[in-house]
């Protein structure tokens, strides 16, 4: 079945071991982010087998895929009030930045006779989620501490995701200072794979004890400079797609070029007549910009919603292999994206 993704669990396991060794030297525990692979249970199990005690996802439906695994389960996107009951049912921990949502979670936790842990998010300048004003954070902390159904687990922040503001020592110290000031320092989550560079430079202060890592544990890559970490593999996920047309055509389109379906005006270089192929795969399946060919002599020219155009500079078979730096649609933002059920998965190792 094509397209398909070959997933090497041994390489994922080794990447996890490398990252755990790095973070443990800095007294930091990992929450393994599973949205990259849609919460696929076998991959989640691989992370747990390597000693990852916490798994997190932005979607409850993904967390339910591995609800029976022996690990703490985090919802790492703020809950909707309408899903408060499900959050308490299936998640041990959730990140929060709205008082009304905390009240809804507390109500559901009391009804279900459970204690739900909450991490309050602090906006340190990326301007996505989190409390920006300290007085609002203090109000939420006071509520969480007295709420019968909630347990204030700690504080967290998120950087390099919206405005791409980078993590630095000053921001980490501010987060740590707030956690100490309000006695909310059981878990202080200092960010995602974009914080690894700061950790490697010994810039994370003692007391920041958690990072939420997906890209680095799966692909061995830190997010700030997009550099691969020594000892990791970047080919744990390989996608294969079938060629549905192979012809010689001009490399420069004929006629006036307009914007594509995504609002971008493509740029082409005239290289004369070239051998090229179309694969049965497109942007609704994969993030084309985060893939690159395995086969020598093949280049990715571009893609539309359902077609991937490659230059066949050298001879290759009818199957094109590409490395994927995310697997939601087999690639970057969710290794298994919108058409996850139209793509076959083949596992090797562990």
Annotate each language-model stretch with its function.
Residues 15-24, 46, 62-65, 181:
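A short, N-terminal amphipathic alpha-helix
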Residues 173-350:
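Active-site anion/phosphate-binding pocket segments in diverse small-molecule metabolic enzymes
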Residues 6, 28-177:
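Active-site-proximal beta-alpha core segment in soluble small-molecule metabolic enzymes
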Residues 15-16, 34-37, 55-59, 79-84, ...:
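A broad, low-specificity signal for short, low-complexity segments enriched in glycine/proline
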Residues 1-7:
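Generic N-terminal amphipathic, Lys/Arg-enriched alpha-helix
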Residues 19-27, 144-151, 178-186, 248:
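A structural motif corresponding to the C-terminal end of an alpha-helix
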């Amino acid at each position: 079945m094509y397209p398909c993704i070959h997933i090497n669990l041994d390489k994922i396991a080794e990447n996890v071991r490398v990252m755990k060794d790095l973070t443990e030297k800095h007294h930091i525990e990992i929450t393994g982010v599973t949205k990259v692979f849609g919460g696929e249970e076998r991959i989640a199990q691989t992370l747990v087998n390597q000693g990852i005690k916490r798994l997190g996802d932005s979607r409850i439906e993904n967390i339910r895929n591995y609800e029976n695994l022996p690990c703490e389960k985090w919802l790492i996107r703020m809950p909707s009030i309408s899903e408060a009951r499900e959050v308490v049912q299936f998640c041990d921990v959730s990140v929060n930045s709205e008082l009304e949502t905390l009240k809804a979670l507390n109500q559901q936790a009391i009804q279900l006779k459970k204690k739900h842990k909450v991490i309050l998010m602090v906006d340190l300048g990326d301007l996505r989620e989190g409390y920006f004003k300290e007085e609002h954070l203090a109000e939420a902390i006071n509520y969480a501490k007295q709420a019968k159904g909630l347990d204030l687990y700690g504080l967290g922040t998120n950087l390099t995701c919206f405005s791409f503001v980078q993590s630095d020592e000053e921001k980490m110290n501010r987060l740590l200072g707030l956690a100490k000031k309000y006695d909310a320092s059981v878990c202080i989550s200092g960010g995602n794979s974009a914080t690894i560079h700061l950790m490697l430079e010994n810039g994370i202060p003692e007391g920041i004890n958690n990072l939420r890592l997906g890209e680095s544990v799966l692909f061995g890559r830190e997010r700030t400079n997009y550099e691969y970490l020594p000892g990791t593999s970047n080919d744990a996920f390989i996608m294969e797609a079938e060629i549905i047309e192979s012809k010689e055509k001009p490399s420069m389109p004929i006629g006036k070029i307009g914007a594509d379906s995504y609002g971008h005006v493509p740029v082409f270089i005239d290289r004369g007549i070239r051998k090229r192929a179309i694969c049965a795969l497109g942007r609704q399946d994969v993030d084309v910009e985060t893939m690159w060919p395995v086969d020598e002599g093949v280049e990715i020219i571009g893609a539309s919603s359902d077609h991937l155009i490659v230059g066949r500079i050298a001879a290759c078979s009818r199957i094109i292999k590409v490395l994927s730096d995310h697997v939601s649609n087999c690639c970057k933002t969710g290794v298994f994206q919108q058409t996850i059920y139209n793509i076959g998965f083949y596992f090797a190792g562990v």
